[in-house]
Swiss-Prot record:
This is 3-deoxy-manno-octulosonate cytidylyltransferase 2. Belongs to the KdsB family. Activates KDO (a required 8-carbon sugar) for incorporation into bacterial lipopolysaccharide in Gram-negative bacteria. HAMAP family: KdsB (MF_00057). It comes from Burkholderia ambifaria (strain ATCC BAA-244 / DSM 16087 / CCUG 44356 / LMG 19182 / AMMD) (Burkholderia cepacia (strain AMMD)). One of its GO terms (cellular component) is cytosol. Gene3D superfamilies: Spore Coat Polysaccharide Biosynthesis Protein SpsA, Chain A. Its EC number is 2.7.7.38. GO terms for biological process: CMP-keto-3-deoxy-D-manno-octulosonic acid biosynthetic process; lipopolysaccharide biosynthetic process. Pathway: Nucleotide-sugar biosynthesis; CMP-3-deoxy-D-manno-octulosonate biosynthesis; CMP-3-deoxy-D-manno-octulosonate from 3-deoxy-D-manno-octulosonate and CTP: step 1/1; Bacterial outer membrane biogenesis; lipopolysaccharide biosynthesis.
Length: 267
């Protein structure tokens, strides 16, 4: 188990769903000789060597790969609609205390920086009143404000989320800034890394989807709808994108090869 400054214990769940419309069997896709889920687990383990890490799966084929490598996993309900639901099941079945922090690290992000994982674990572990936490970075290209695939978040003076949207928020009534969007400190891009107090995670997973969540297709809006505060940790830049399609595989493999050649972790 990992704790920070005598704070709360931090645990990690990596959801891995076998069925993917755009990339069937995604957790087991080969990335330069290793299945993707193995690489994600290795990245998390390198960042948090003492943490309790569980891969939440839904298929025996993933179990076989993980078992052969001695990686801890939990078989979860195949009917879950999201990784949050899988993380909640693992935390509940494992009997983790309500106050423990549960990090949800997406299983299709093999290039998530270890420094980001370490910083976020520390952020969640040290938070005195953790409910939900996530990450955002500056938007440094004005054009990204109009990109629906880039989720934007607006925060208050405490660093808590006011709203997430695929639309350009905040809206500039007098026209877009001429320089980089990020220089204003108001235009933030959401990074899909989450941390929860286990009690909050269970409450969130048991609640029905809200209308805003269904409209924007953004699960985190459920927490705001329920009145749950979301603390946003700022990070300087966006990590490399994860894997959703076959084209993404070649891009990630190229970055992995470069990383190995450089003997560093720039990605």
């Amino acid at each position: 188990m990992t704790s920070f400054n005598d704070g709360r214990t931090v645990r990690v769940v990596i959801p891995a769903r076998y069925g993917s419309t755009r990339l069937p069997g995604k957790p087991l896709v080969d990335l330069d000789g290793e299945p993707m889920i193995v690489r994600v687990h290795a990245r998390v383990r390198r960042a948090l060597p003492d943490a309790d890490i569980v891969v939440a799966i839904d298929d025996a084929r993933i179990a076989e790969v993980l078992d052969a490598r001695g990686i801890r996993f939990a078989m979860t309900d195949t009917g879950h609609a999201s990784g949050t639901d899988r993380a909640a099941e693992v935390a509940r079945v494992s009997g983790w205390p309500d106050t423990d922090a549960v990090l949800n690290v997406q299983g299709d992000e093999p290039l998530v920086p270890t420094a980001l994982l370490q910083a976020f674990a520390g952020f969640c572990g040290a938070a005195p009143d953790l409910g939900v936490a996530t990450v955002a970075c500056p938007i440094d290209e004005v054009a990204l404000l109009d990109e629906p695939a880039i989720v934007k978040v607006v925060v208050d003076h405490r660093g808590r989320a006011l709203y997430f949207s695929r639309a350009a928020i905040p809206f500039c009534r007098d026209g877009r800034p001429a320089d980089s969007a990020g220089s204003h400190g108001l235009f933030l891009r959401h990074i899909g890394l989450y941390g929860y107090a286990n009690a909050t995670l269970q409450a969130l997973a048991s609640a029905a989807p809200c209308e805003l969540e269904q409209l924007e297709k953004l699960e985190q809006l459920r927490a705001l709808w329920l009145g749950m505060p979301i603390d946003v940790m700022r990070w300087p830049d966006a990590p490399p994108a994860g894997i959703d399609t076959p084209d993404d595989v070649a891009r990630v493999v190229s970055l992995l090869k470069r990383q190995t050649h450089d003997a560093t972790e720039p990605y």
